C-alpha cells in the first residue's frame, strides 16, 4: 500500500518508516547468504531529478551530482561515467552541493519542492533530509554534521528538515550559508555550530557575491 487510506496521500512518516524497515531487513538478509546474483537491467540513459551539480574548482575532471532519490554521485571523467558516493548517503534527497575556499565539500539534503492542486493541497510531499554532510578528503568520505541533523525525522516543519541551497564564502574556509525551511543560517566554524542570519521562514536559495 502506497497511500494513506485516510488521506489518500503518501505520508512522509510512512515513507521514512518503510525506509528504516528496508534498511533493517537488508542488514539481516544479505543476498550473498542466499546465493543470489544480481545484475543491473536499467533503465539506461534516463536521468532522474538532479537538483545539484558541482565541478571541483581544484580538479575540473571531478564532478558531483545530487539526486533527490538516489543520493550523491561522483565522476572523475568529466561526467562521462559516474559512481555513487559512500553508503551513508544512499537514497538521500540531495538538494545542494557547495565547495568551500579550501576545497571541502558540503552536501545539503531534503527536498522541499512540492506539487499542489488549485486549492493549495499538496499531492507530492517533500522528502525530509538528514541535514548537511561534509567531506574534507576530496569526496572520498562524507560525515554528517551533528549540528544539522533534524531532531524529528517524521516532522517536516522541524529545523534542518530541508536544506535547499548551500553557498560558501570565497575567502573564508569555514564560512558557509544554508537556505533552510527554518531560516537562513550561517556557520563560521565549518559547520560545527550555526546561527540565524535571518530567523524563521522558508528559504530556498542563497548566493554569495565575488567580494564575499
Where are these regions (language model features)?
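Extracellular glycan-interacting surfaces
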Residues: 1-212
